[in-house]
Amino acid sequence: MKRFDELYEELLKATIDNREEEYIENLDAFDAHQLDCLLNPKKHPLVWSTKSCECPKDDRHCVKVCPFHAIFPDESGQLQVDEAACAGCSYCIQECRAKRLTASKDAISVLRALRSHKGLSYALIAPAFLGQFKDVTPGKLRTAFTKIGFDGMLEVALFADILT
């Protein structure tokens, strides 16, 4: 059976390469719930369980650290996330010793939306990316965005200049 991270990486690459349907048709030995989480992230909580929890019932750090009491064991002892209560703070993910929790992944649904959208789509970025990604120039970033389906890129600072 494919691990969650393998399924995500392969599906993301297939989506980028416009081979998503072919990939899914040929997929075997996978967790259907994990695939549904990746294809339809809005139908699932902000935090996903990628495997069954095997922590002792009285020593689940993820449950203890959640300030919103959004993660809890169900009747069978498996972890559930209350979608309404979860704020996506990721404390539970950081505290999961077995690394069986992950944050919602929406890159695939964004790529699908870009491809099906009629009209122009621009990536709006903060100028802080220059300090965060030293080797990435605005030109490289713009090229990357256009390769995945955006029509262009605008820095949000441009709008601040226009409005002031």
Over which residues does each language-model region extend?
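Iron-sulfur-associated redox domains of electron-transfer enzymes in respiratory
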Residues: 1-15, 20-22, 104-164
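Short, glycine-/Ser/Thr-/acidic-enriched flexible segments
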Residues: 28-31, 42-45, 87, 128-130, ...
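Iron-sulfur cluster-binding cysteine motifs and their immediate structural context
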Residues: 57-82, 87, 91-107
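Ferredoxin-type iron-sulfur electron-transfer modules and their immediate structural context
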Residues: 1-65, 69
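N-terminal juxtadomain amphipathic helix
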Residues: 44, 48, 52, 82-84, ...
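Gly-rich Lys/Arg/Thr-decorated short loops/hinges at beta-loop-alpha junctions or inter-strand turns
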Residues: 41-47, 90-93, 122-125
